[in-house]
């Protein structure tokens, strides 16, 4: 079965990354940690841990833009483990309003994890499965 991305007439996505709230907030540009022809990387304005970064593609090319962002996020996460003594990291995306997406331009979160950043790590076994409350346990 071939996977396709259906485009809706009432597509909620922005036309350009420059239309997103982070592009209009001067503070966001003060927090840029990397920029090249493909991606802007900056510190999240509402970080859940120290080092929480957003990877924002400059072009909207469906799967390609997100693939590039995941690759960058993975590389930065590995560097964080090696250089900043992070224990681990989560990489994630909220795709669509029902998934919690609030900025309607594709972007990837990379969240560093450290010992003690959650009360009982064994209780949250399953990681991202817990985005649906009480359904992540197995």
Residue positions per predicted region:
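HIT superfamily nucleotide-processing domains
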Residues: 1-138
């Amino acid at each position: 079965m071939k996977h396709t991305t259906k485009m809706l007439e009432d597509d909620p996505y922005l036309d350009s990354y420059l239309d997103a709230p982070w592009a209009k907030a001067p503070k966001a540009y003060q927090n840029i940690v990397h920029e090249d022809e493909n991606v802007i990387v900056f510190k999240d304005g509402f970080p859940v841990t120290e080092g929480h970064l957003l990877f924002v593609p400059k072009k909207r090319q469906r799967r390609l833009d997100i693939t590039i962002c995941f690759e960058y996020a993975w590389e930065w996460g590995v560097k964080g483990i090696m250089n900043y003594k992070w224990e681990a990291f989560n990489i994630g995306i909220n795709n669509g309003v029902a998934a919690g997406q609030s900025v309607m331009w594709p972007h990837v979160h990379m969240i560093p994890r450290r010992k003690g950043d959650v009360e009982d790590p064994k209780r949250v076994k399953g990681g991202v499965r817990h985005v649906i409350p009480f359904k992540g346990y197995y």
